[in-house]
């Protein structure tokens, strides 16, 4: 089975721009690529920061763009989002009994548990007891025959970019304790960082991917401001194969340069 993961769309109301870029145009391009190349996917997941300022008009524009997909779409919260506006504009968004945008995506092969780490008034992430209890319950319902994955907006660790490390998930101990009490998820997806980062945390493999509208520049020294850029965006194509093999490709969906083969005369010495 296959699914698609995007993050950090940072929508503004239709017709507006953000940092001189057009989030709607970029997501529309991603939607077109997914329609053309990945119509066999089970679902699409967006791991938070759906909008930049949490405006209702921005959620309306996001909803219009995503209507171009003939696939189920699951939306998560990020620190730039407004929970009340999101649920009002897009009532199909799943929330738990406490009103947090938390849910589990289930297929015969997979349980993907999606957590809400957003806290109004701060860019950093937090998991309160209610949210951790949700995770504890969902992990407890996972059978040994099904792959378990986890998705959060905020990573619970430093990535080495000081301006972002200051606004990560600040209370990771509670998350660690819940995970230690269960069979661990086999993979974790994060957003928030606006860079392609992968590694191991607590022995668990994870992936962070680039955002849709803009990226964070690769600056390991600046701590007072978050340096931004318009490096190319991407989305992830996640495939689970019958033998349990997990494969993740990234799609640079805005690339429109030439395609050639290793037999191309000018490139024979390179390949």
What is each model feature region?
Residues 12-15, 52-57, 79-87, 120-123, ...:
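Active-site environment of divalent metal-dependent phosphoester hydrolases
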Residues 1-13, 109-119, 149-152, 204-210, ...:
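Active-site-proximal beta-strand elements of phosphoester/diester hydrolases
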Residues 56-144, 174-177, 181-184, 202, ...:
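Extended active-site neighborhood of metal-dependent phosphoesterases/phosphodiesterases
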């Amino acid at each position: 089975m296959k699914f698609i993961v995007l993050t950090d769309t940072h929508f503004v109301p239709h017709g507006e721009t953000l940092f001189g870029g057009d989030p709607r145009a970029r997501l529309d391009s991603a939607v077109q690529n997914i329609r053309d190349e990945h119509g066999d996917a089970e679902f699409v997941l967006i791991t938070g920061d759906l909008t930049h300022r949490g405006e209702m008009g921005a959620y309306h524009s996001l909803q219009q763009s995503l209507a171009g997909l003939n696939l189920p779409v699951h939306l998560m919260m990020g620190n730039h989002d407004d929970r009340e506006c999101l649920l009002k504009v897009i009532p199909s968004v799943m929330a738990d009994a406490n009103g947090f945008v938390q849910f589990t995506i289930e297929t015969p092969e997979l349980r993907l548990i999606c957590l809400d780490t957003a806290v109004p008034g701060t860019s950093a992430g937090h998991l309160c007891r209610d949210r951790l209890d949700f995770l504890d319950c969902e992990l407890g319902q996972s059978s040994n025959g099904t792959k378990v994955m986890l998705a959060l907006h905020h990573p619970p660790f430093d990535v080495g970019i000081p301006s972002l490390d200051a606004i990560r998930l600040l209370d990771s101990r509670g998350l660690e304790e819940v995970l230690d009490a269960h069979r661990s998820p086999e993979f974790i997806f994060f957003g928030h960082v606006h860079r392609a980062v992968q590694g191991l945390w607590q022995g668990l493999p994870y992936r962070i991917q680039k955002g849709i509208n803009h990226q964070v520049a690769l600056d390991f020294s600046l701590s007072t401001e978050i340096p931004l850029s318009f490096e190319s965006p991407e989305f992830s194509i996640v495939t689970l194969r019958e033998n349990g093999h997990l494969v993740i490709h990234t799609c640079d969906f805005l690339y429109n340069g030439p395609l050639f083969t290793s037999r191309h005369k000018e490139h024979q010495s390179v390949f």
